[in-house]
């Protein structure tokens, strides 16, 4: 179960909402997992500003407290950490009841392991105003209920979620969430951007190169790498004689590199001997202009092709250790 959870947490963490140039986001991800016979459910909470994890709470820690995960958060005083710790512990307590409620909605036994997930946050536009707010809930890794874009109504995916929707409509939960997303969330985001401006407002351009991988039947794979960039928003495309190969291109999700930067690659399969007809195009806000690369016309970094695969695995495992967990949802908020 532990390995399954780690894979779940990394998969969700790697799908963080990316913001465009000039935009910023504050997001919180909570996860609660029941574990029969092993004590109380595991609860973990992480917060992100843009692509940077800045706070974390783990109920399995020796002394569970909200802790800084970015150096610039060490500027906050004891009152802040005590307040955030109490908030996290309040979520932990409510999720225990929520797990039991969810099991009853789906007529599940108490013997298995079950997962509640909740994600919420706000995006700031380049003008400093709220661009969008969002709040999503899931059970057993599947969508359950979500706040709509108007921040006033809910979308429930099944009959159990309809029960929750009716309860929340009667309790005016959407109005409270809207007030938080438009007010406190945006105020907090502005504060964190000020605290971490040297890190959060920087731009690190990608280091890019193309690798060559022979295949059978007279074909080769060209893989375009972008490494060491920040923020995470980047565009990689392959073109054949100036025309984009969107459908024929394999593109991986942007991955954290474990050092505060990101990596990504895109590949295409091409006929042997025709490699020079294909160009990779890299666009990132840290670049003065987009890069155009061909196989054999860019100085690769000191990594072998085999090492790159190893690096990708290590990066994902590092992301597990650093990120810890993703999303959480609440069925009943008390």
From Swiss-Prot:
Alpha-2: annotated span: 112-203
Keyword Hydrolase recorded: no
Keyword entries, A-Z: Disulfide bond, Glycoprotein, Immunity, Membrane, MHC I, Signal, Transmembrane, Transmembrane helix
Carbohydrate attachment residues: 107, 277
Coiled-coil segments on the chain, per record: none
GO BP annotations, alphabetical order: antigen processing and presentation of peptide antigen via MHC class I; cellular response to type II interferon; embryo implantation
Topology of this chain in the membrane: Single-pass type I membrane protein
Region (Alpha-1): 22-111
Keyword check for Transmembrane: yes
InterPro entries referenced in this protein's UniProt entry, alphabetically: Ig-like_dom, Ig-like_dom_sf, Ig-like_fold, Ig/MHC_CS, Ig_C1-set, MHC_class-I_related, MHC_I-like_Ag-recog, MHC_I-like_Ag-recog_sf
GO cellular component labels: lumenal side of endoplasmic reticulum membrane; MHC class I protein complex; phagocytic vesicle membrane
Subcellular location: Membrane
Homology family: Belongs to the MHC class I family.
Full protein name: H-2 class I histocompatibility antigen, Q7 alpha chain
Encoding gene per record: H2-Q7
């Amino acid at each position: 179960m532990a390995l399954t959870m780690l894979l779940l947490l990394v998969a969700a963490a790697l799908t963080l909402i990316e913001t465009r140039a000039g935009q910023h986001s504050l997001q919180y991800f909570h996860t609660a997992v029941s574990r029969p016979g092993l004590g109380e459910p595991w609860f973990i909470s992480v917060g992100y500003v843009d692509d940077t994890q800045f706070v974390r709470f783990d109920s399995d820690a020796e002394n569970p407290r909200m802790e800084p995960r970015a150096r610039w958060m060490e500027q906050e005083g004891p009152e802040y950490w005590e307040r955030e710790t109490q908030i996290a512990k309040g979520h932990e307590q409510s999720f225990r009841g929520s797990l039991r409620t969810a099991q009853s909605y789906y007529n599940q036994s108490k013997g298995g392991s079950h997962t509640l997930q909740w994600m919420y946050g706000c995006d700031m536009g380049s003008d400093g105003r709220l661009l969008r707010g969002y709040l999503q809930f899931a059970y057993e890794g599947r969508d359950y209920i979500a706040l709509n874009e108007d921040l006033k109504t809910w979308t429930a995916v099944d009959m159990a979620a309809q029960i929750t929707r009716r309860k929340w409509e009667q309790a005016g939960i959407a109005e409270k969430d809207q007030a938080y997303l438009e007010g406190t969330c945006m105020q907090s985001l502005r504060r964190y951007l000020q605290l971490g401006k040297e890190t959060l407002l920087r731009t690190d351009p990608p280091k890019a190169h193309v690798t060559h991988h022979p295949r059978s039947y007279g074909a080769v794979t060209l893989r375009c790498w972008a490494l060491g960039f920040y923020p995470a928003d980047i565009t990689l495309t392959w073109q054949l004689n100036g025309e984009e190969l969107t459908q024929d291109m394999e593109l991986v999700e942007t991955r954290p590199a474990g050092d505060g930067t990101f990596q990504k690659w895109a590949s295409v399969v091409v006929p042997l001997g025709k490699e020079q007809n294909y160009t990779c195009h890299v666009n990132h806000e840290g670049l003065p202009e987009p890069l155009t690369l061909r196989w054999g016309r860019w100085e690769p970094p000191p990594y072998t092709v085999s090492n790159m695969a190893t690096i990708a695995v290590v990066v994902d495992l590092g992301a597990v250790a650093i990120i810890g967990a993703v999303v959480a949802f609440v069925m009943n908020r008390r």
